[in-house]
């Protein structure tokens, strides 16, 4: 019979009611993961869980369940004597061992009339007879046999799981996720420590950017077996507009991060979360210096968890690649209207108070209008997002007005030939001045804002596009700070 062996990690050191509850949570998550494979039958023993079903599918799904140390697809038999084990091993492995160096690893649990070494010797003998050569130090093939009671499990594959604690064993956290590289990793790391993680995404772009971000979040939540996580989508446009009107540009980075914290706290309280989580890494960008972090969290009455605080970018990227979000995150367009070209790394208390006052109404509006989508509804929600299919183009049509949405200094250093400059708040005035019957093509540092502006103008009946190629055409020295 085919089975998947599930090994648990930290859970084994727990005792009593705590362990029983964690086992319940892990089994609940495992059952949800198994639904992707048509379901499974589970059996539990001390230190092991066995899943019977579509083994090839289950080994992949169950290796993404938090609390699982590793899994192995295996063949299980009921034996009566040691020769039964050797015969099964010969049947399974004789066909692949010829001419290969191999090792037999045996693990036993319980009382038996033989030792692990005796089993290894018996199995090794039949595999040598099949043309293999024993090499315990540097084998080409490793054959594993696990013996528990009168059952023997045969396997060759050990697939690493995420480890950690079962999801839901450590309370609820609201993660501020931009869908860039860092913040999904931070959310994943807290999920790994047993937290139920809901996600807050602050949308500053149009439908295309939102869809892309939700695909990243969906990839993250593919790990959240056992919890139908909430995705809170907040239209943060009001905050960006209020900030540009009422906050000095050098403080935009700090102001926007602080607004995110304020929005997060209010939504977290409504959801019953007891902490916020962010993807900040100390010193990575100007808004993540100690001085800046002290300014943005001053007066915030909720714990702020920063799992990445001591990691460098290379470490974070490796984690993102491991959990499967990196490729999508790296392609996410950035909104470039809320980052200062010369950001301040600190703020005085009175400046922070002024920021709170300037953004209070906008923050309230964002919180009250936020949408909540459950993980299981996310696919349908994404499918329902229908941006114009032709909004991104590679070159401007003849006679089109090309509009540079970057700051004035960057425009002076470099811009596309014939382009005019306009800030995001000036776009409508520019269109009214030049005529709504013209075609407008926008570009920005990396595309997020230009997509958003083009889509917004199309809703007003104006022919507008975002220029795709400028994402790589804008000189790196002109590009704004990338958020988390």
UniProtKB/Swiss-Prot annotation:
This is tRNA sulfurtransferase. The active site is at residue 444. Gene3D superfamilies: 3.30.2130.30, HUPs (3.40.50.620), Rhodanese-like domain (3.40.250.10). ATP binds at residues 176-177, 257, 279, 288. GO terms for biological process: thiamine biosynthetic process; thiamine diphosphate biosynthetic process; thiazole biosynthetic process; tRNA 4-thiouridine biosynthesis. Its EC number is 2.8.1.4. It is an enzyme of class 2 (transferase). Residues 56-158 form the THUMP domain. The lineage of its organism: Archaea, Thermoproteota, Thermoprotei, Thermoproteales, Thermoproteaceae. The keyword Acyltransferase does not apply. Its main location: cytoplasm. Residues 396-479 form the Rhodanese domain. It is found in: Cytoplasm. CDD domains: PPase_ThiI, RHOD, THUMP_ThiI. Pathway: Cofactor biosynthesis; thiamine diphosphate biosynthesis. The keyword Lipid biosynthesis does not apply. It comes from the Archaea. Belongs to the ThiI family. Disulfide bonds join 336-444. Keywords: ATP-binding, Cytoplasm, Disulfide bond, Nucleotide-binding, Redox-active center, RNA-binding, Thiamine biosynthesis, Transferase, tRNA-binding. One of its GO terms (cellular component) is cytosol. GO terms for molecular function: ATP binding; CCA tRNA nucleotidyltransferase activity; tRNA binding; tRNA-uracil-4 sulfurtransferase activity. Catalyzes the ATP-dependent transfer of a sulfur to tRNA to produce 4-thiouridine in position 8 of tRNAs, which functions as a near-UV photosensor. Also catalyzes the transfer of sulfur to the sulfur carrier protein ThiS, forming ThiS-thiocarboxylate. This is a step in the synthesis of thiazole, in the thiamine biosynthesis pathway. The sulfur is donated as persulfide by IscS. InterPro entries: Rhodanese-like_dom (IPR001763), Rhodanese-like_dom_sf (IPR036873), Rossmann-like_a/b/a_fold (IPR014729), ThiI_AANH (IPR020536), ThiI_fer (IPR054173), ThiI_N (IPR049961), THUMP_dom (IPR004114), THUMP_ThiI (IPR049962). It catalyses: [ThiI sulfur-carrier protein]-S-sulfanyl-L-cysteine + a uridine in tRNA + 2 reduced [2Fe-2S]-[ferredoxin] + ATP + H(+) = [ThiI sulfur-carrier protein]-L-cysteine + a 4-thiouridine in tRNA + 2 oxidized [2Fe-2S]-[ferredoxin] + AMP + diphosphate; [ThiS sulfur-carrier protein]-C-terminal Gly-Gly-AMP + S-sulfanyl-L-cysteinyl-[cysteine desulfurase] + AH2 = [ThiS sulfur-carrier protein]-C-terminal-Gly-aminoethanethioate + L-cysteinyl-[cysteine desulfurase] + A + AMP + 2 H(+). SUPFAM superfamilies: Adenine nucleotide alpha hydrolases-like, Rhodanese/Cell cycle control phosphatase, THUMP domain-like.
